[in-house]
Regions:
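N-terminal intrinsically disordered, cationic/polar leader segments
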Residues: 1-88, 102-130
């Protein structure tokens, strides 16, 4: 059985941008560091949420996980697990927004099923040369 630990949750950027944004946007970047015991996986998550017709909220977070006994081959085969961690990173971004900008708790955010992220994860794994 694999143990997954959350080892880092941090807010990098939280700004209100005075430009219109039609709909929610997001992006993430996987940064795995493989070791003898497993992999440290940092996920940078960027979230852009419309506040009103003239402004949006820009949030960048970092969530770190330690995935015990993961090597490169196992990491590549566990797309569903990684998708769940990206989904967790997205939820962490929302929680950090709620903590730091309580007056903006009304801002709606769409959550996605973890399968939604799988194509991008596969692409990033390929780009990492794994």
């Amino acid at each position: 059985m694999t143990t997954i630990e959350v080892i880092e949750v941090g807010l990098d950027t939280l700004e209100i941008i005075n430009e219109p944004l039609e709909e929610q946007r997001y992006g993430f970047l996987l940064s795995p560091a493989f070791g003898k015991e497993g992999v440290n996986l940092r996920i940078r998550f960027e979230l852009l949420l419309p506040i009103n017709k003239k402004q949006y909220l820009f949030c960048k977070t970092i969530t770190g996980f330690f995935l015990e006994n993961f090597n490169q081959d196992y990491f590549k085969s566990e797309i569903e697990t990684i998708s769940g961690l990206v989904q967790t990173s997205m939820a962490n971004a929302r929680l950090l927004i709620m903590q730091k900008q309580q007056k903006l708790n009304y801002v709606q955010m769409k959550y996605f099923d973890n399968k939604y992220f799988q194509d991008e994860i596969k692409l990033q794994i390929k780009e990492l040369g794994l």
